[in-house]
Curated annotation (Swiss-Prot):
Bias (Polar residues): 91-123
EC class (word): hydrolase
Gene3D superfamilies (alphabetical): Cytosolic phospholipase A2 catalytic domain, Jelly Rolls
Region (Disordered): 49-188, 199-218, 1230-1249, 1274-1293, 1305-1353
Intervals of motif DGA/G: 1095-1097
Descriptive protein name: Patatin-like phospholipase domain-containing protein ZK370.4
A GO biological process held by the record: phosphatidylcholine metabolic process
Low complexity: compositionally biased ranges: 49-64, 1328-1337
GO cellular component, one term: endoplasmic reticulum
Location of the protein in the cell: Membrane
Annotated EC: 3.1.1.-
Locus of motif GXGXXG: 946-951
Topological type in the membrane: Single-pass membrane protein
Length: 1353
């Protein structure tokens, strides 16, 4: 037996070895076979048998003569692309010369080459032909290789030119070139390239698909349009005058008479307008530059504004004086020529003639003037500069001019005032009503006959108020017109901290919390109050309070409108009653404060322009762009260009109008002048500056630059640009979209925390008139919509299903456009939105959000990329549509297409259903509520940090958030947080997340997977294949675009050394990149650009700042990272490794805590992350959570349940505390949410140098420029010195003075009406120290225009 065993032992061992290593043997055989194939293929070809030779030669013998074949073999040897040479040169075209030099063998030899299978020449030809075929295959494989050099490309081009150029001489290889080419074409090189290229085939294909699927924004999205040129049929002066008067919307009856235009030329320094001249014309600069100055005592002049060519010098308030026949003159305002220029002067006295002919036609222009006064002048000076009482004329100065009128009828009534019986509070109510009628008629400029008295008496009622009673609160919308009959009222304003009143987040909260109410003006008997509110339809600008026991006559808005229809001439006296209370200071400032109207696409300013003014957005929307990249967007209430004005730097970005916008322009000279006149303005501006610098959504100066995927399309992430929205247009993508139910659902979700108005064509036609929808631009409709936008914080415009005038109007009015589509259907080739964009430019620059509606039973969305690749969308949202939205679909199916496009009856039914059943049951966790919070800037973001197995605590925190009713609108994470966040974004159900996360943690606990994934540690210990398989099995091929909730994850790009924020692409790949710990897993090659990505924890382990930049107002950050020990051993300035080793080996001592090389490298890698985390902890927007997970290690994946329960316990306590301490009511229940008002936009301003500190900017803001005042005519007008006139450094110091520089002229007959007060010249002071001004406005000026006398000492 031993003999047989020893005989067959090797055989038994061989069989056993083969049986146990079948795969290894097969792999070895395949490798050897492949190598043998390439070697034999390169050296000998496939075969040398006669049959193969015959088969190879037969096609040639059939297709061409023997003589032709004899020429082909040498030709193949001389060119690089022999097949093409055979095809082109083998049968040369007629008339094409050929210079190919070949040696023709004898014919007998050619026959032998064809018929003999053993001929050596034919065998060599075959080998060369096959070798060249392999070369061609190799070139086709590597032609797209990124490693190709320009030399290779040029060689290919030369070869193509040689081959395809008919009749050209084939290029012969040089000796060196041939050897070099042979080395690159070896079989081993081919195999190497096949392996290398094949391993990247998936990622290359993915990259090409991603580049093709995303649509770039249109060119108009970033670049402003050019200004319109002057029509050739119009003279420049006519064009400029009409352009500057366009904002008034003058009646069609008024026509411009070119004969009234006077054009004059001026030299530099010449006066165009001097103090004392009449203010009854508009001045327009045809060419050159003009400067506006304020003239003071002793001939001092102060530059406050520069007017370029095309600009105008005119105050709209002066127009009311002219219409009221009040002589208006310039007090101290002067206009001078900075350069040699031409100026057009147009007298506006023709306005008065047109007004007297048709007062009703001038109601709209008068309303525009009063609205401009409120929106531009009063709002800017009060809310942004902190002025209140300075804006109104003081009582002792105003007493003389109350009830002043210019009409002859009213003058007659004023002359009889002293003979009238005064109002007696003890009279009966009927006698009081008679007096009230008469006084009200006089205030309206009417004759108090029986008819007028009867009409007024039916529309007014009398009320009595005790002292201190508040009649109307500031900001109230109660529109009434009141006349004081007895006693007096006080108009007061609260503190001017605009942002603190709205958001209560001011830098000086302690001061703003105190009630700061200041009395502005006192209103006495026979004066009107409330005209500003009733004419503009705006909330009250003042708080009206009774100073003593007061008796007033009140006319409500509807009664005033009815009386106005009968007597349209009363509109002007009511407007002038507002004008008479304005202080001389405000009337002077009005000349320098510009009302800028910017149409869609036009630039407010461009990059590189001098920053000589700041802008306040009154309405509309603007976008700041830089190098085809969106920096930010501005909405109502935002301030533009303040930082650049302070730092005196050119504009860093270009700001263009997204839609028609109105702005208030404050020149730098005017800003400095106001600070000199009222130094407290400087403190207010410092406070405003501090509000911008205290914003927590500013990027930290040390933060790594973020690369968001939409940057490749020329824009930053759009979610941060949809804040501060005031108007939203909803456009259906197809006729089957339930548009009316969608707008009702959105209205329901938005109305939980602010007032919302939903407008459709049907509702507008019912409120106004169906005829307003027939015109493309109806002024009545435009004004009505503007009033609604001023009244309601948010307006939803519901578009029609077709291209109607109403649809175009909605797009023009919209700050953002929501394109609603059915998610389960493929996008149509021609949608309504695309048709609208092709037909006109309305809304082409507006951010468009794609809304995909899905049935409630949908598990996960899919196919989102098909929608995104057809049209450009700045963002997308997935919404589960409740079943109630689809209950009207059957009715739509029964209707014709025309009936579907105008669903009037169905709309009424839908609205009625929602009003009865839906509007009273808010649901904060619905998808519509999530969309509403994102649109209003109140999104709640959840950030999950990295920490390995400790990330199981995130699952517990998610369950705690759900139990406490805290919704999550955006999810982001790093490392393990990206995986848990991806699970929640894919399925927003904490139970499902827990199940799937537990399964993945269980797989990560397997030791065999780790052993099978081990490899030679060149880049990492593991290949990453098993880890990739586990994540792929979890997410499959899900894309980030197909997640229910907006999601991002963080990775570290070691190719460019920056942080990457991923918001699109394959979910598993970027989760894998975010979890790739260096040394354990190799970096992931980005599927889009091939960059190497590692764990995001190296740069930002808790990306709360990224979440804030994406638009989240409240960020809940859960940190599960390890805490590094800081109590280390102090070993001095040198360290011996042997000493440390001996200390650790000593069993009787405690080893010192000294970092080894691996720990030092790890801490260096996390330096920026640790610093970022400290900033996040201190941020006011961040709610920082840290479960007690210190006992657990990074790789404790088997302890999932234990860690999760710990996170759940901690999360319940933390969430309860968050809701308790949430003063803003963002995280609380519905009742708390209703107390919250929408956040106003206070985003960061365009980038300025970070070297400029807040202290430097505050000093620049509050600094009063010290300049040397000069006498008139001595001002330097050289624009080459320190820039154009009117820029920084060209202003003049203003001494305290009586600021009587308005165009205000009062009737002398109105002085001391009741005879109960006496005035002297010294008492007629409004602002500043005593001066020589006399009473009555115009009396203080010399009628001849001479220099005013100096003030008395």
């Amino acid at each position: 037996m031993s003999f047989f065993y020893s005989l067959f032992a090797p055989l038994i061992f061989l069989v056993t070895f083969i049986y146990n290593h079948v795969l290894l043997i097969l792999f070895t055989v395949c490798i050897i076979g492949a190598a043998a194939f390439f070697v034999s293929y390169y050296l000998f070809g496939y075969s040398n048998t006669p049959s193969s030779a015959s088969s190879s030669a037969t096609p040639s013998s059939r297709n061409s003569p023997n003589k032709e074949r004899s020429k082909k073999v040498p030709t193949i040897l001389e060119t690089d692309n022999e097949d093409d040479e055979i095809r082109v040169n083998g049968s040369p075209k007629s008339g094409t010369p050929t210079n190919t030099q070949t040696i023709e063998p004898p014919t007998s030899l050619n026959l032998n080459m064809v018929n003999s299978a053993s001929g050596s020449n034919l065998s060599g030809a075959r080998r060369m032909r096959k070798r060249d075929w392999a070369k061609k295959l190799y070139k086709s494989l590597v032609q797209d290789s990124p490693g190709r050099t320009p030399t290779d490309e040029s060689s290919d081009e030369e070869n193509a030119n040689v081959v395809m150029g008919g009749g050209s001489v084939p290029r012969r290889r040089s000796k060196h070139g041939n050897s070099s080419r042979r080395r690159q074409s070896t079989a081993f090189q081919l195999a190497k390239d096949l392996i290398r290229r094949g391993s990247r085939s998936y990622f290359r294909q993915n990259q090409e698909n991603n580049k093709d699927t995303r649509v770039r924004p249109p060119q108009e999205f970033f670049e402003p349009t050019d200004l319109p040129e002057i029509p050739q049929n119009l003279q420049p002066e006519i064009f400029y005058i009409l352009h500057n008067l366009k904002m008034l919307e003058l009646p069609s009856e008024w026509k411009l008479d070119p004969r009234e235009i006077e054009v004059r030329s001026f030299q530099a320094g010449d006066y165009i307008v001097k103090p004392g001249e009449s203010d009854d014309a508009i001045y327009v600069a045809i060419d050159g530059e003009l400067t506006v100055h304020i003239r003071h005592m002793e001939g001092k002049e102060y530059l406050v504004k520069c007017i370029p060519a095309g600009g105008s010098f005119f105050s709209l308030l002066s127009m009311l004086d002219i219409l009221m026949d009040f002589p208006s003159i310039f007090r101290t305002v002067a206009l001078k020529a900075a350069d040699p220029c031409r100026v057009a002067k147009f007298p506006i006295t023709s306005f008065r003639e047109s007004y007297h002919k048709n007062p009703e036609a001038w109601i709209r222009p008068i309303q525009i003037v009063i609205t401009r006064l409120l929106h531009v002048t009063l709002t800017t000076l009060h809310q942004y500069m902190g002025l209140s009482s300075e804006l109104m004329r003081r009582r002792r100065d105003d007493d003389r001019h109350r009830n002043g009128s210019s009409t002859s009828k009213l003058q007659l009534s004023l002359s009889l005032k002293k003979k009238e019986k005064p109002f007696n509070i003890n009279d009966n109510e009927q006698d009081q009503l008679i007096v009230a009628r008469k006084w009200m008629a006089e205030a309206f400029g009417l004759v108090a006959d029986d008819v007028v008295s009867e009409q007024i008496g039916s529309k007014i009622h009398l009320e009595s108020y005790e002292a201190g009673h508040v009649i109307i609160e500031q900001g109230a919308e109660e529109e009434v017109l009141m006349m004081v009959l007895h006693g007096n009222l006080i108009l007061a304003q609260y503190g001017s901290d605009f942002f603190a009143q709205i958001e209560r987040e001011s830098l000086f909260d302690e001061e703003n919390n105190e009630e700061d109410e200041s009395a502005v003006i006192r209103v006495t008997a026979r004066e009107l109050v409330g005209g500003l509110q009733i004419l503009t339809n705006e909330p009250s600008f003042y708080t009206i309070r009774a100073a003593v026991q007061t008796r007033v006559a009140i006319m409500k808005k509807k009664d005033f409108s009815a009386f106005l229809e009968a007597h349209p001439e009363i509109y002007l006296p009511v407007a002038h009653s507002v004008l008479r209370r304005l202080s001389p200071f405000l009337r002077g400032v009005d000349f320098a404060l510009d009302w800028v109207l910017v149409d869609s696409g036009h630039a407010c300013y461009r990059a590189g322009d001098m920053a000589d003014s700041l802008f306040v957005v009154l309405s509309g929307r603007l976008r700041s762009v830089e190098k085809k990249t969106v920096v930010e967007e501005f909405g109502r209430g935002d301030v533009l260009g303040m930082m650049e004005v302070l730092t005196k730097k050119p504009r860093a970005t270009t700001v263009l109008a997204v839609r028609f916008s109105q702005l208030a322009r404050v020149p730098e000279g005017l800003l400095n002048f106001i600070k000199m006149q009222y130094p407290q303005v400087g403190f207010r501006l410092v406070q405003l500056l501090g509000q911008y610098y205290s914003q927590t959504n500013r990027r930290a100066p040390f933060a790594a630059p973020t690369v968001i995927r939409t940057n490749e399309l020329g824009a930053t992430d759009p979610m941060s640009h949809i804040k501060n929205l005031h108007t939203i247009a909803v456009v259906p993508a197809s006729p089957d979209v339930p548009l009316v139910p969608f707008t009702c659902e959105l209205y329901h979700a938005l109305s939980s925390n602010l007032r919302v108005l939903r407008l459709s064509s049907q509702k507008v036609a019912a409120c106004l008139d169906p005829s307003v929808l027939e015109k493309q631009a109806d002024f009545r409709l435009m004004h009505w919509l503007n009033v609604q936008e001023d009244t309601y914080p948010l307006v939803i415009y519901e578009c029609d299903f077709t291209q109607t005038n109403w649809t175009r109007r909605c797009l023009r009015q919209a700050d953002a456009i929501l394109v609603v589509a059915i998610g389960g259907k493929t996008p149509e080739k021609q949608t309504l939105m695309r048709e609208l964009m092709n037909m006109n430019q309305d809304g082409v620059r507006t951010n468009k959000e794609l809304i995909l509606l899905w049935p409630e039973s949908t598990k996960t969305p899919s196919g989102t990329i098909e929608w995104l690749k057809n049209s450009y969308f700045s963002g997308h949202h997935h919404i589960r549509a409740p079943k109630r939205m689809l209950q009207w679909n059957r009715k739509f199916r029964k209707m014709s297409r025309a009936e579907v496009m105008t669903p009037t009856s169905v709309e009424n039914e839908v609205i009625e259903y929602y009003e009865k059943n839906v509007f009273w049951t808010p649901d904060r966790r619905s998808d519509f509520s999530r969309l509403a919070r994102i649109l209003t800037g109140n999104a709640i973001g959840l950030v999950l940090g990295g920490g390995g197995a400790r990330g199981a605590a995130h699952v517990g925190v998610l369950r705690a958030l759900r139990e406490e009713g805290i919704p999550v609108d955006i999810v982001g994470g790093t490392s393990i947080g990206s995986l848990i966040g991806g699970l929640y974004a894919e399925t927003p159900d904490d139970v499902v997340v827990e199940t799937r996360a537990a399964s993945w943690f269980n797989g990560m606990s397997s030791l065999w997977r780790k052993l099978l994934d081990l490899t030679y540690a060149h880049s990492a210990m593991f290949t990453g294949a098993q880890f990739n398989f586990s994540i792929k099995d979890l997410f499959e091929e899900r894309l980030i675009e197909d997640l229910w909730i907006s999601y991002f994850c963080i990775s570290t790009d070691i190719s460019t050394s920056e942080m990457r924020v991923h918001r699109s692409g394959p979910l598993w790949a970027y989760c894998r990149a975010s979890m790739s710990l260096a040394g354990y897993l190799p970096p992931l090659c980005d599927p889009q650009d091939g960059h190497l990505l590692l764990d995001g924890g190296y740069v930002n382990n808790v990306p709360a700042d990224v979440m804030r930049n994406l638009g989240a107002r409240c960020v809940i950050a859960c940190d599960v990272g390890s805490i590094e020990e800081t109590n280390l051993y102090d070993y001095g300035d040198s360290l011996s490794g042997m000493w440390v080793l001996l200390k650790r080996l000593n069993p009787f001592g405690t080893p010192p805590r000294i970092l080894n090389m691996e720990e030092i490298q790890s801490r260096l890698a996390y330096v920026s992350c640790v610093r970022q985390l400290e900033v996040v902890k201190k941020a006011s927007y961040c709610r920082y959570l840290r479960p007690p997970i210190e006992p657990f290690k990074t790789l404790d994946f088997p302890k999932f349940q234990e860690i999760m329960e710990l996170g759940l316990k901690y999360g319940r306590e933390a969430c309860h505390e968050l809701i308790t301490n949430d003063r803003a009511g963002i995280l609380g229940d519905e009742k708390e949410t209703r107390k919250f008002k929408r956040q106003q936009s206070r985003r960061e301003k365009p980038d300025v140098s970070r070297a400029v500190s807040f202290t430097d900017l505050a000093a620049a803001m509050s600094k009063i420029p010290v300049v040397r005042p000069t006498l008139r005519h001595s001002m330097s007008l050289n624009p080459s010195a320190n820039g154009p006139v009117g820029r920084a450094g060209d202003h003049f110091l203003l001494d305290d003075d009586l600021f009587n520089d308005t165009d205000y002229y009062e009737e002398e007959s109105s002085q001391s009406e009741n005879g109960n007060e006496s005035f002297t010249e010294d008492e007629d002071l409004v602002i500043g120290p005593p001066s020589s001004s006399s009473s009555g406005g115009n009396v203080s000026e010399n009628p001849r225009g001479t220099t005013p006398r100096p003030p008395s000492s």
